């Protein structure tokens, strides 16, 4: 191509298989229209960030505020595919901060009456000290997130017997100490936001 040519690439990811990646591509990357994709991304972010409106302050302060909100919503990534499959890497031997001899499994999320997965599975950094900030802010602006994340964490525990501290690609990382995910799950329940998993089942996982 010439130096003035534009090069376009569509890219998707699957944690399960190349076949699933191709299916994700067909579902999620349906156009070569770059401007249309950009507008859709802007509309999506405006919808999420626009749930909290601020007035006053300088343009620089407002920019910083919404940049911080963007970070609040970043860092947790779906690992399930369009067909509902996701990797389970919880079955192995713990060795310090790692899991050895992992037996990789592919699991499939259940679907509701409308054919949608009941919740998504997520990667996430640890929830260390988020009871002071993230848990509260999510509950105010994005109440579906504590519900989604709690359901994901509970399913990790169903698969591997532990509620993850920082779930990664369907497995455990053993980062931090204690169980920083617990305040998030309890917060979702106390606020009446836990709808995608059974609270009693979640409680029994701690016994």
Model-assigned labels for residue ranges:
Residues 1-8:
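Short, small-residue-biased leader/transition segments that mark boundaries at the very start
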Residues 69-82, 122-146, 186-193:
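Alpha-helical support elements that line or immediately flank enzyme active sites
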Residues 114-119, 129-130, 134, 169, ...:
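Flexible glycine/proline-enriched surface loops and loop-helix/loop-strand junctions
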Residues 10-122, 142:
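Function-dense linear segments that define catalytic or interfacial modules
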């Amino acid at each position: 191509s010439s130096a003035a040519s534009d090069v376009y690439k569509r890219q998707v990811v699957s944690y399960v298989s190349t076949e699933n990646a191709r299916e994700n591509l067909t579902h999620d990357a349906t156009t070569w229209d770059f401007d249309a994709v950009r507008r859709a991304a802007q509309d999506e972010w405006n919808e999420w960030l626009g749930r909290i409106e601020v007035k006053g302050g300088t343009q620089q302060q407002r920019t910083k505020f919404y940049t911080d909100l963007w970070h609040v919503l970043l860092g947790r990534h779906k690992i399930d595919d369009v067909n509902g499959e996701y990797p389970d890497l919880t079955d192995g031997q713990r060795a310090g901060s790692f899991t050895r001899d992992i037996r990789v499994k592919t699991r499939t999320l259940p679907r509701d009456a409308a054919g949608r997965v009941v919740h998504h599975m997520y990667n996430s950094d640890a929830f260390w000290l988020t009871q002071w900030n993230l848990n509260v802010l999510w509950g105010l602006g994005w109440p579906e997130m504590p519900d989604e994340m709690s359901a994901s964490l509970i399913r990790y525990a169903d698969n591997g017997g532990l509620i993850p501290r920082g779930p990664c690609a369907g497995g455990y990382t053993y980062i931090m100490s204690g169980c920083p995910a617990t305040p998030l799950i309890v917060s979702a329940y106390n606020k009446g936001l836990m709808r995608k998993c059974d609270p009693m089942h979640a409680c029994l996982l701690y016994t």
